[in-house]
Amino acid sequence: MPPTPEVGLPLWLLAELTYRCPLQCPYCSNPLDFAAQGQELSTEQWFKVMAEAREMGAAQIGFSGGEPLVRQDLAQLIAEARRLGYYTNLITSGIGLTEARIADFKKAGLDHIQISFQASDEQVNNLLAGSKKAFAQKLEMARAVKAHGYPMVLNFVTHRHNIDKIDRIIELCIALEADFVELATCQFYGWAHLNRLGLLPTRAQLERAERITNEYRDKLKAEGNPCKLIFVTPDYYEERPKACMNGWGNLFLTITPDGTALPCHGARQLPVQFPNVRDHDLHHIWYESFGFNRFRGYEWMREPCRSCDEKEKDFGGCRCQAFMLTGDASNADPVCAKSTDHGIILKAREEAETAQLAIEQMTFRNDRNSRVIARG
């Protein structure tokens, strides 16, 4: 067994400001029972979190949700993050964004805005978002972000209902003069895991989409267009797991709306007691808490991970995925072909070939559905 690696610094702080959101995306990574979570942190409590994380080495902060724009103190939080020396990111649907708020955020020192789209087609986008005005608002705000001097960074979550239109998605991004485009195939956590049958593309769909993306990359390069296309494949079509979050509690720190501290944004579902910033400072949470030490190093590993010569590269894969698919977070990530549970992934691929679940049949992420799930 190699020596336990030194604990890294929490360089990347994800501030999940709220679970409130005007949209109802069926692939949202928020917890299914978000409606039953506790009271949101106050402005002053977030200031304390940001200051403590910065003292520990955090360099970049992402403001997300839910929809972070519903927080009326967002400009204050951005300004304080800037004062502390963070590189600041706003991760938003664009719903609730206005020219005036963009100007306020610019004045507060915001460095980066990423706007998410559900599809290139207005009808599909609005259906997935649960809002008839979502698409038009997103287009308007994407242009406004660019007009205020920000790079245009767009995120399209792709899945079986929109991935066959990847060419239209890319054409829309080119028309908008986007600088960076993330074509991120759905990752199956939270609501996406619940709706997997309606979201997981087939292998043929993925291969076609990646081929078309590569063709557009070549075309953009030949034309001297600086637009960068980033294509992200789902774990379910890999044979080896990802080094999730660069290792458990090693780089990435999430603070949820109620102050729960997590080593990744999906960890809340695990049967692990995670600390809260209302009760402990971040130094204690990061270095001493049980939750953040639970899957550090290699001692927790079972076979085949324990004796695997790749464990220092992938850390056994994703603990949340292992828990969701096998019921035990200490098991190998079933994505790995060496896992005795890899058949779960193979079965999911097979089911994707014949799945018939329509968009309208999926369970949408909203308060009503969340309350039903929370009641069990």
UniProtKB/Swiss-Prot annotation:
Pathway per the UniProt entry: Cofactor biosynthesis; pyrroloquinoline quinone biosynthesis
GO molecular function, one term: iron ion binding
Gene Ontology biological process terms, A to Z: pyrroloquinoline quinone biosynthetic process
Keywords linked to the UniProt accession: 4Fe-4S, Iron, Iron-sulfur, Metal-binding, Oxidoreductase, PQQ biosynthesis, S-adenosyl-L-methionine
Ranges of residues in domain Radical SAM core: 7-222
Residues binding [4Fe-4S] cluster, per UniProt: 21, 25, 28
Catalytic reactions on record: [PQQ precursor protein] + S-adenosyl-L-methionine = E-Y cross-linked-[PQQ precursor protein] + 5'-deoxyadenosine + L-methionine + H(+)
Cofactor note: Binds 1 [4Fe-4S] cluster. The cluster is coordinated with 3 cysteines and an exchangeable S-adenosyl-L-methionine.
Signal peptide residue numbers: none
EC number: 1.21.98.4
UniProt enzyme class: oxidoreductase
Cofactor: [4Fe-4S] cluster
Entries under CDD domains matching the protein: Radical_SAM, SPASM_PqqE
HAMAP family associated with the record: PqqE
Subunit structure: Interacts with PqqD. The interaction is necessary for activity of PqqE.
PANTHER family reported for this sequence: PQQA PEPTIDE CYCLASE, RADICAL SAM DOMAIN PROTEIN
Membership in a protein family: Belongs to the radical SAM superfamily. PqqE family.
Biological function: Catalyzes the cross-linking of a glutamate residue and a tyrosine residue in the PqqA protein as part of the biosynthesis of pyrroloquinoline quinone (PQQ).
Protein name per UniProt: PqqA peptide cyclase
Species of provenance: Pseudomonas putida (strain ATCC 47054 / DSM 6125 / CFBP 8728 / NCIMB 11950 / KT2440)
